[in-house]
């Protein structure tokens, strides 16, 4: 399988942390507050796009990928994650999803193999330029990318981002304009970008969802 994207050694601190947090990640409160709102928006976009070969990058314990398979029933669904602990949980969740151990910067797909890529609340952990280059490589012309990432604005949110950056470097939540620029540089037309609010208290740090179409 071909790959033109540069790669990096995936941050072992991040991977190890998510291995340890895999069971906590699945709790109802964590999912409802942090993850469910952008996942709902992502599924709605995939439904509108009628996507048939979909990969969830940074899939974690597989909740979104399993929902995509169950609710949309596309031809193929792939869940990709760099954390073995997360993937262990995911494999037990849905055997109809193909679960793959890999990083966003070096995806295990042929050129043009997919028609949609999604990533929710994980993009800040990627080498973002390398990742979107890979997204463009594995998507066919007209393929959809959906990126939902936390948007840090205001002094409290910026302080949280600084702590995250110091603890989990090279993690970085891009500003909305950065995400648009990354996609355009990689060969995407930006279709839409909007905030997705979580329940309180996490309205302080909303998600921004960005949609791109492969040129």
Residue ranges and their predicted role:
Residues 105-117:
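A short acidic, Gly/Pro-enriched loop at the edge of an enzyme's catalytic core
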Residues 116-129:
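A short SAM/SAH-binding and catalytic strip from SAM-dependent methyltransferases
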Residues 2-48, 63-67, 146-170:
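Conserved class I S-adenosyl-L-methionine
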Residues 188-199:
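Conserved S-adenosyl-L-methionine
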Residues 129-141:
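A short glycine-rich, Lys/Arg-flanked "PGG" loop and its adjoining helix->strand segment in the class I
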Residues 171-187:
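Short alpha-helix
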Residues 55-57, 61-106:
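Class I SAM-dependent methyltransferase SAM/SAH-binding core
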């Amino acid at each position: 399988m071909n790959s033109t994207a540069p790669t990096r050694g995936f941050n072992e601190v991040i991977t190890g942390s998510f291995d340890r947090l895999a069971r906590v990640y699945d709790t109802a409160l964590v999912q409802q507050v942090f993850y469910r709102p952008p996942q709902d928006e992502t599924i709605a976009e995939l439904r509108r796009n009628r996507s048939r070969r979909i990969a969830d990058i940074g899939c974690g314990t597989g909740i979104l990928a399993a929902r995509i398979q169950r609710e949309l029933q596309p031809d193929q669904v792939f869940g990709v994650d760099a954390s073995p602990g997360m993937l262990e949980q995911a494999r037990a969740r849905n055997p109809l999803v193909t679960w793959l151990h890999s990083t966003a910067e070096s995806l295990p797909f042929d050129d043009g193999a997919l028609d949609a890529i999604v990533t929710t609340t994980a993009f800040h952990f990627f080498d973002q330029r390398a990742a979107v280059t890979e997204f463009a490589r594995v998507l066919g012309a007209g393929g959809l990318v959906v990126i939902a990432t936390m948007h840090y604005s205001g002094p409290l949110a910026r302080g949280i981002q600084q702590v995250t950056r110091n603890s989990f470097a090279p993690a970085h939540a891009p500003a909305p304009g950065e995400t648009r620029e990354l996609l355009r540089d990689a060969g995407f037309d930006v279709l839409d970008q909007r905030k997705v609010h979580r329940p309180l208290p996490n309205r302080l740090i909303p998600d921004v969802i960005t949609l791109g179409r492969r040129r």
